[in-house]
């Protein structure tokens, strides 16, 4: 059976994201009503952190526990990952003893190599190239508060980093637009951003383009 990973935003289809949002609404309703809901009972999430984090660790660890599962925290300082063990070997061992793996690391190549040797799904908790879980949460919040994001416009001001790259992928999946304003030398790189279809973004000169960029934006 093909293992489904979430390494960058475009790994999931629009239909799959809609299903996730429907389940999210159900889980939130049950949680607010103090109704136990443990679909992940006896399941284990391994969280591998090469880059430090507060919110990512808290959200994943609390989330898996609220759904009945358990979380194991690993970092490169106290595991073989920091002592030169090949990523592929680590993936085979860790995935034998877990049901799900989340990795927060530097290079996208590392998480892709891990996923290629893993027996269980792998989630990108952040890399230098992408931050899919962050934008997944952002879009769910927008839809929850304002309705459909289709056809809307998002403003991005700053360098074309991992978050920007992920917004651009999300725009292609959800069919909205992104107005991007970056400092000189930090413009969008379509290949690095992993764009695969019709462009859903427009670039504005920084800093003078920021005001024009933000006009009529929805987020």
Regions found by a protein language model. Give the residues of each.
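Active-site-proximal loop->helix
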Residues: 72-94, 117, 169-170, 187-199
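Short, structured coil segments at secondary-structure junctions
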Residues: 67, 97, 117-119, 174, ...
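Anion-binding alpha/beta catalytic cores of soluble intermediary-metabolism enzymes, centered on
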Residues: 91-94, 99-170
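Short, acidic/turn-prone active-site loops that include or flank metal/cofactor-
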Residues: 76-79, 126-130, 183-186
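Positively charged, low-complexity intrinsically disordered leader regions
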Residues: 1-58, 62
């Amino acid at each position: 059976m093909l293992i489904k990973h979430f390494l960058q935003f475009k790994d999931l289809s629009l239909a799959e994201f809609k299903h996730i949002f429907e389940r999210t609404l159900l889980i939130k309703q049950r949680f607010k009503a103090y109704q136990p809901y443990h679909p992940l009972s006896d399941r284990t999430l391994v969280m591998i952190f090469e880059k430090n984090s507060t919110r990512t660790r808290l959200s994943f660890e609390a989330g898996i526990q609220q759904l009945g599962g358990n979380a194991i925290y690993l970092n490169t300082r106290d595991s073989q990952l920091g002592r030169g063990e090949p990523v592929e070997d680590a993936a085979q061992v860790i995935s034998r003893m877990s049901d799900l793996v989340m990795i927060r690391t530097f290079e996208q190549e590392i998480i892709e190599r891990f996923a290629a040797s893993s027996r269980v799904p792998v989630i990108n908790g952040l890399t230098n190239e992408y931050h899919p879980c962050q934008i997944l949460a952002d879009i769910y919040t927008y839809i929850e508060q304002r309705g459909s994001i289709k056809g809307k416009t998002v403003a991005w001001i700053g360098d074309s980093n991992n978050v920007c790259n992920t917004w651009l992928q999300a725009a292609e999946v959800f069919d909205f637009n992104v107005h991007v304003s970056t400092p000189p030398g930090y413009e969008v790189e379509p290949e690095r951003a992993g764009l695969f279809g019709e462009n859903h973004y427009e670039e504005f000169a920084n800093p003078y383009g920021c005001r024009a960029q933000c006009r009529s934006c929805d987020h």
